[in-house]
Every structure is written in structure tokens, then in C-alpha cells.
């Protein structure tokens, strides 16, 4: 049985306040996009895991697919499985690829083994793996608050817009992203901004992390500028980076123009 875990982008990100536990409260919009890994499981006489595609520099036991399987094993009887992950979503990009793999693993094993686990329980299990992991269980647009772990569904469709996603060969650490951000409640909530036409987002929707990341990694800012120069209605860094996306009314041709040739590049229409 096979499934295709998809990435997400952050539409805006406001760092609202610092918490007593040292973490930060944020607000952002998670929106699913059709940039996908492939995850397959088959019955086997022993559990084994293999991975191809984009290399991930992490030991197997720390892979979130394995963490998802182990989380299920503490609650249910799971037979031995042969697992293969084809990695196509860039990691360290603010796209939630690892969390998507884990959430889709929970759903895949649930279906494969006929466990009939309710989505609410799958979300609860996913929450033990990562803050944004539960989002991928239902995989629909949400207004995320708290540490990015509290979700409220939003009525938002970007169907028929064109997406260009660019990820340079740059890594951004979370402490680095927060380093120059002063937490503050936004004047206008993202829930209000997304009700406006996309063409009005540029002047109203911000990602607070850009003010920390851009001075340290100017290549990321240049990508955003290039997307706007290419006709983007809205462009922004996703999460803490380092990927940048642009939303367009028409198909983009950055690959044909040999722009971003040293970056991961995905262009396509949203559905």
C-alpha cells in the first residue's frame, strides 16, 4: 500500500508572545501543497526501513516514520512491515516534510491493518511526534496558534493559483530565526487577512522570521525579490525557512529561464 505525504506552506507567521516555558506563541496559516514524498508499506516477516531520494543526515531510529510506527506499536498490535520512503520534499525548509511523513505513516498503517482509528485519536498520537504533525491527519487549511500545535479550520482555497517553491542550499536554525524577533500581537489577525484578495496580502501579511533570517542569509531575500519581479501576487519565506514560495495568476517558467538553477525548484498549479 502506498501514499504520498505532501508538504505545507506557512501563509504569514506572527510571533505573538513568549511563554513561561521558553517557547513562543505564534499564529500562522498552514496550507497543504502538492509537493510530495512517496511512502510504501508491505507485509513482511520482519520490520525494515529503507529510504531513497533526497538524502537525510539522521540515524534511522530518529526518522519520524519510525517514530510514528513505534507510537502505534505502544497502542496496537502491528505486524512486521517493510517500509520504503522516497524523499522528495526538502528538509530544513519550513515545509513540514518529516511531520507529513509521520502523519501519513499513521494513516497508512491504520488503513493497511484495518485498525479503524478515529482521526481524533490519530491527531493525538501525531501530537506526540511533532507540533505540526497533527495538521497532516486531516490535511486541510488551518489557523495555527500556540506553538503551532492548536488548529482552527479556515475557509481558504488557492485553487487554480500557480505556486513556485524555491529552497536554496541554506540551513536556518530555530534560535537563529527567533533571534531578532520582538514578540507582539499583530494589528490584524491572519484570519482576517486571508479573507482579502491574494493581491492585497503583500502589504498586510508578514512572516516575522524574515527580519532575522534575511540579514544573515541574503540569498533567501533575493529569491523572494526575484519571485515578485517575476509577477508573484504574494511571496514569502515559509516558516523559519529556508524555502520561499510565490503565488501567481499564471504559470511560471523560472526553470526554463535557468533561474534558481542551484536551488530546489517546484512549479505547478494548486488544486
Swiss-Prot record:
Which InterPro entries does this entry report, sorted A to Z?
A: GHMP_kinase_C_dom, GHMP_kinase_C_sf, GHMP_kinase_N_dom, IspE, Ribosomal_Su5_D2-typ_SF, Ribsml_uS5_D2-typ_fold_subgr
Q: Which SUPFAM superfamilies match?
A: GHMP Kinase, C-terminal domain (SSF55060), Ribosomal protein S5 domain 2-like (SSF54211)
> Catalyses which reaction?
4-CDP-2-C-methyl-D-erythritol + ATP = 4-CDP-2-C-methyl-D-erythritol 2-phosphate + ADP + H(+)
Kinase among keywords: yes
**What's the EC number here?**
2.7.1.148
Binding residues annotated for ATP, in chain numbering: 90-100
GO MF, one annotated term: 4-(cytidine 5'-diphospho)-2-C-methyl-D-erythritol kinase activity
Listed under GO biological process in this entry are: isopentenyl diphosphate biosynthetic process, methylerythritol 4-phosphate pathway; terpenoid biosynthetic process
**Which keywords label this protein?**
ATP-binding, Isoprene biosynthesis, Kinase, Nucleotide-binding, Transferase
Q: State the top-level EC class.
A: transferase
Active site feature = 8, 132
Pfam families of this UniProt entry?
GHMP_kinases_C, GHMP_kinases_N
Cysteines engaged in disulfide bonds, as pairs: none
Q: In which pathway does it act?
A: Isoprenoid biosynthesis; isopentenyl diphosphate biosynthesis via DXP pathway; isopentenyl diphosphate from 1-deoxy-D-xylulose 5-phosphate: step 3/6
* Protein's UniProt keywords contain Kinase: yes
As for family, the record states: Belongs to the GHMP kinase family. IspE subfamily.
Q: What does this protein do?
A: Catalyzes the phosphorylation of the position 2 hydroxy group of 4-diphosphocytidyl-2C-methyl-D-erythritol.
Q: Which PANTHER family match?
A: 4-DIPHOSPHOCYTIDYL-2-C-METHYL-D-ERYTHRITOL KINASE, CHLOROPLASTIC (PTHR43527:SF2)
Q: What is this protein called?
A: 4-diphosphocytidyl-2-C-methyl-D-erythritol kinase
Organism of provenance: Parabacteroides distasonis (strain ATCC 8503 / DSM 20701 / CIP 104284 / JCM 5825 / NCTC 11152)
Which gene is annotated as encoding this protein in its UniProt record? ispE
Amino acid at each position: 500500500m502506498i501514499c504520498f505525504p505532501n508538504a505545507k506552506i506557512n501563509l504569514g507567521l506572527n510571533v505573538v508572545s513568549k511563554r513561561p516555558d521558553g517557547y513562543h506563541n505564534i499564529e500562522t496559516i498552514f496550507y497543504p501543497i502538492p509537493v510530495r514524498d512517496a511512502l510504501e508499506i508491505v507485509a513482511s516477516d520482519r520490520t525494515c526501513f529503507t529510504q531513497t531520494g533526497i538524502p537525510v543526515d539522521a540515524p534511522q531510529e530518529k526518522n519520524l516514520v519510525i517514530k510514528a510506527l513505534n507510537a502505534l506499536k505502544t497502542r496496537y498490535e502491528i505486524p512486521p512491515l517493510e517500509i520504503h520512503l522516497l524523499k522528495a520534499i526538502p528538509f530544513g525548509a519550513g515545509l513540514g516534510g518529516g511531520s507529513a511523513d509521520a502523519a501519513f505513516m499513521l494513516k497508512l498503517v491504520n488503513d493497511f491493518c484495518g485498525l479503524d482509528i478515529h482521526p481524533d485519536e490519530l491527531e493525538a498520537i501525531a501530537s506526540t511526534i511533532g507540533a505540526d504533525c497533527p495538521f497532516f491527519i486531516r490535511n486541510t487549511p488551518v489557523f495555527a496558534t500556540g506553538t503551532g500545535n492548536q488548529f482552527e479550520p479556515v475557509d481558504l482555497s488557492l485553487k487554480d493559483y500557480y505556486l513556485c517553491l524555491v529552497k536554496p542550499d541554506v540551513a536556518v536554525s530555530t534560535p537563529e530565526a527567533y533571534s531578532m524577533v520582538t514578540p507582539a500581537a499583530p494589528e490584524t489577525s491572519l484570519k482576517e487577512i486571508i479573507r482579502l484578495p491574494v493581491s492585497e496580502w503583500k502589504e498586510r501579511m508578514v512572516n516575522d522570521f524574515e527580519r532575522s533570517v534575511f540579514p544573515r542569509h541574503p540569498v533567501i531575500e533575493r529569491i523572494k525579490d526575484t519571485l515578485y519581479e517575476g509577477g508573484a501576487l504574494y511571496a514569502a519565506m515559509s516558516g523559519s525557512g529556508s524555502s520561499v514560495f510565490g503565488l501567481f495568476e499564471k504559470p511560471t517558467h523560472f526553470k526554463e529561464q535557468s533561474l534558481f538553477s542551484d536551488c530546489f525548484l517546484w512549479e505547478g498549479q494548486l488544486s
